[in-house]
Amino acid sequence: MHLLGFFSVACSLLAAALLPGPREAPAAAAAFESGLDLSDAEPDAGEATAYASKDLEEQLRSVSSVDELMTVLYPEYWKMYKCQLRKGGWQHNREQANLNSRTEETIKFAAAHYNTEILKSIDNEWRKTQCMPREVCIDVGKEFGVATNTFFKPPCVSVYRCGGCCNSEGLQCMNTSTSYLSKTLFEITVPLSQGPKPVTISFANHTSCRCMSKLDVYRQVHSIIRRSLPATLPQCQAANKTCPTNYMWNNHICRCLAQEDFMFSSDAGDDSTDGFHDICGPNKELDEETCQCVCRAGLRPASCGPHKELDRNSCQCVCKNKLFPSQCGANREFDENTCQCVCKRTCPRNQPLNPGKCACECTESPQKCLLKGKKFHHQTCSCYRRPCTNRQKACEPGFSYSEEVCRCVPSYWKRPQMS
């Protein structure tokens, strides 16, 4: 297939993806804003779709190989396809069976690119046209602007200069580093006063190239130190946050949006898109090294913490002990976060809870009350002082009345009353 034909197919698919269709805005998107309050105005479904479509268009225009193109359109299936190629061929397996839930148009388009010869042919043609140093012949006289009565033999030399196509009309293929080659030629001047004179001339030879914008070219030409300039990207006031499951970060509106707004599909209302981009199932992803479905984000048994273990089928941390609420006993409940039975008993103020025994325990005792000069009350679990029945109205000088012994005692015996 010719490269132009491939681009025509890709453009038609892009147009299909950009066609507006009836669709409801994701209700949960409002809860996952970054850098904005919940009270801020949410973009409507049309705005979100427009940004998503623009992102898709920019990604398609910026791809520079078949691998990048397929990664944008079919990320999970493309991983599986490359895995199967490394293992010796595309075989129908459990993961590929999920294709049955896709739309017929999408299956046909994806299946067309599973032909290895087509992919290889397109990729070879693509590589030939990329921006890179290419061997060219340059006219020596035109290169240096010599007088019309002077010419060189051979008239041309072979050097490397940057050439090829860029992925955007706003970019041009330019050299980022240059070396100089010395070549020996015959210089002839007419009228001929002497024979051809051997001369050594240095020619610029491009060693590396890059697609650059006009602004980057201007900066590089006018820079004292030649260096590549990083492309400027739009910056969000808030940092790129980790989005919830099935949501992706959008740099244009600086918030999380549902993945379905970003995914390529011929039918905007197809609710089976999520499975198309997730052939391994929920909480799993394809490991390109082993070609096996593994838990996302490198989840391992050690990541689950105490009292939990990793369920490799669901890729979720589950409780080891398999306890049920009925097994916890009276006044206890099963805590799914800690995977343990926790005490839920409510105790009176003067009988604090002992979490280990899950019992209300009295903190006072007859011995403790006696040391305070009080008596112990069993029903209330508290110390109390019995009132004096024969209280004296006055004590002699140097004495004071003691509520503890109900008599006058020397004042220096008096100690602060204990509650």
Swiss-Prot record:
Expressing tissues: Expressed in the spleen. Expressed in the lymph node, thymus, appendix and bone marrow. Expressed in the heart, placenta, skeletal muscle, ovary and small intestine. Expressed in the prostate, testis and colon.
GO molecular function annotations of the record: chemoattractant activity; growth factor activity; vascular endothelial growth factor receptor 3 binding
A Pfam short name: CXCXC
Compartments, as annotated in UniProt: Secreted
Ranges of the Sequence repeats in the UniProt entry: 280-295, 304-319, 328-343, 347-362
Effect of residue 227 to S: No proteolytic processing and lower effect on VEGFR-2 and VEGFR-3
Prodomain positions: 32-111, 228-419
Biological process per Gene Ontology, one example term: positive regulation of epithelial cell proliferation
Role: Growth factor active in angiogenesis, and endothelial cell growth, stimulating their proliferation and migration and also has effects on the permeability of blood vessels. May function in angiogenesis of the venous and lymphatic vascular systems during embryogenesis, and also in the maintenance of differentiated lymphatic endothelium in adults. Binds and activates KDR/VEGFR2 and FLT4/VEGFR3 receptors.
Disease: Lymphatic malformation 4: A form of primary lymphedema, a disease characterized by swelling of body parts due to developmental anomalies and functional defects of the lymphatic system. Patients with lymphedema may suffer from recurrent local infections. LMPHM4 is an autosomal dominant form with onset at birth or in early childhood. Affected individuals manifest lymphedema of lower limbs with prominent veins, and impaired lymphatic uptake and drainage. Additional features are nail dysplasia, skin hyperkeratosis and papillomatosis.
Name of the protein described by the UniProt record: Vascular endothelial growth factor C
Source organism (scientific name): Homo sapiens (Human)
Gene encoding the protein: VEGFC
